[in-house]
Amino acid sequence: MKLSDVQKRLQAPFPAHAVAWKPGVITKDRSRALMLAHIDARNVQDRLDAVCPDAWSFEVEVVPGTRLPTVKGRLTVLGVSREDIGEAPEGDLGTLKAAASDALKRCAVQFGIGRYLYDLPKQWVAWNDAKREPVSPPELPEWARPDHERSPGGAHLVQAMDQLRYEMPEDLELQREVYKHLKAALGSLHPISGGNQGRAA
C-alpha cells in the first residue's frame, strides 16, 4: 500500500460533531466573533489508525530557548515523512503535550488531514462574552461534511452510534433491545431478499 492509495481517505471530512470552533477575532464591543474550525489531535490519531493503523508514527523533538513550549514534530505515513513546528498556547495550557498536539495537527495537514477546514468561508457569529462561547455554533457547509451526513438526520445517527461506544447499557436485556433496533434499521438500508432476516440474539 502506498500513500497515494489512501490519500482520499486521509483527506475525507470529519463528522460534524468532531469539528470544534474557537474565536479567531472578537469585535471591540465583544458582541461578535470570527470563528475558526479545528479538530483535536485525537481525531488525527483516529483517522490514521482507521486508514493505516500499522504504518504511521510520530516523533517530537523539543526546541530549546523558546518563550513558549515548542517542539518539532515528524509524522511518517507509509514511509513518507512531513515535519512542522508545534507551539503551546499561553497560560495554564502551555505544556509540551499541547505543543506536541499542535505539531501533530500541523504535520497531518501536510498529508491533507483536516486541510479542508482552511477552505471554510469566514463565519462571524453572535458572541457570549460571559460564557466565552458563541451564542450558537456555526454550521458546516454541505461540502465539508462526510457523505453520510449530507442526508437528513445523518449527523444525528452518527452521533448516536458514536455515543453507544461509550454508553452501552450494562443490562443484557437492554443490550438485546438496542441490538434489535440497530439490526432492524440496518436491515432497512440493505434488505435481504426473501424477507427472512432472522431474529436478534
UniProtKB/Swiss-Prot annotation:
Keywords for the protein's UniProt record, in alphabetical order: DNA damage, DNA repair, DNA-binding, Stress response
Keyword Cell membrane recorded: no
Stored InterPro entries: Rad52_fam (IPR041247)
Molecular function via GO: DNA binding
One Pfam family matching this protein: Rad52_Rad22
Induction: Induced to high levels following extreme ionizing radiation exposure. Also highly induced in response to desiccation stress.
Domain free text: The N-terminal domain (1-160) is sufficient to pilot the oligomerization process and to bind specifically single-stranded DNA, but is not functional in vivo.
Function noted in UniProt: ssDNA-binding protein that contributes to the ionizing radiation resistance of D.deserti. Plays a role in DNA repair and genome reconstitution, in a RecA-independent process, since DdrA is essential for recovery from severe genomic fragmentation as a result of exposure to severe levels of ionizing radiation in an environment lacking nutrients. In vitro, binds to the 3'-ends of single-stranded DNA, and probably protects them from nuclease degradation. Thus, DdrA is part of a DNA end-protection system that helps to preserve genome integrity following irradiation or desiccation.
Quaternary structure and partners: The truncated form (1-160) of DdrA forms heptameric rings that can assemble into a 3-ring structure.
Protein family: Belongs to the RAD52 family.
This protein's name: Single-stranded DNA-binding protein DdrA
Annotated organism of origin: Deinococcus deserti (strain DSM 17065 / CIP 109153 / LMG 22923 / VCD115)
